[in-house]
UniProtKB/Swiss-Prot annotation:
Origin species: Albidiferax ferrireducens (strain ATCC BAA-621 / DSM 15236 / T118) (Rhodoferax ferrireducens)
Name of the gene: ppnP
Function, in words: Catalyzes the phosphorolysis of diverse nucleosides, yielding D-ribose 1-phosphate and the respective free bases. Can use uridine, adenosine, guanosine, cytidine, thymidine, inosine and xanthosine as substrates. Also catalyzes the reverse reactions.
Keywords: Glycosyltransferase, Transferase
Gene Ontology cellular component terms for the protein in this record: cytosol
Broad class of enzyme this protein falls into: transferase
Family: Belongs to the nucleoside phosphorylase PpnP family.
Name the UniProt record assigns to this protein: Pyrimidine/purine nucleoside phosphorylase
Family matches, as SUPFAM superfamilies: RmlC-like cupins (SSF51182)
Length: 105
């Protein structure tokens, strides 16, 4: 099921903007201290580097992603999630706005 809203959170009002505006997100902290980001990636092919482990959840649009050591692009659509280990690069390819929640840790 696709997450449609997150209750009882603190939201960073200043956006994090990456890749010349191709990725824009806002940090979210839940009441229990859990951190997430909510954002959008505009059409592009990008390489991200994780710090902590991440779970990417697609809430609208779609993307293709490729994890390290793989040459295979996998598809993520609304309701799908994929995991990336910490301190790891991954590639993402977007042909339409991809709206996501990034779950950290």
């Amino acid at each position: 099921m696709t997450t449609t809203h997150i209750d009882q959170v603190s939201v960073s009002t200043q956006a994090s903007v990456y890749f010349d505006g191709k990725c824009i997100s806002h940090g979210v902290t839940l009441a229990d201290g859990t951190k997430k980001s909510v954002g959008v990636i505009l059409p592009a092919t990008l390489t991200f580097n994780t710090g902590a482990p991440e779970v990417m959840e697609c809430v609208a649009g779609s993307c293709d992603y490729k994890l390290p050591g793989s040459e295979v692009w996998l598809k993520s659509k609304p309701g799908d999630k994929f995991s990336i280990p910490g301190n790891t690069p991954f590639d993402i390819r977007v042909t339409e706005p991809y709206h996501y929640i990034c779950h950290f840790g």
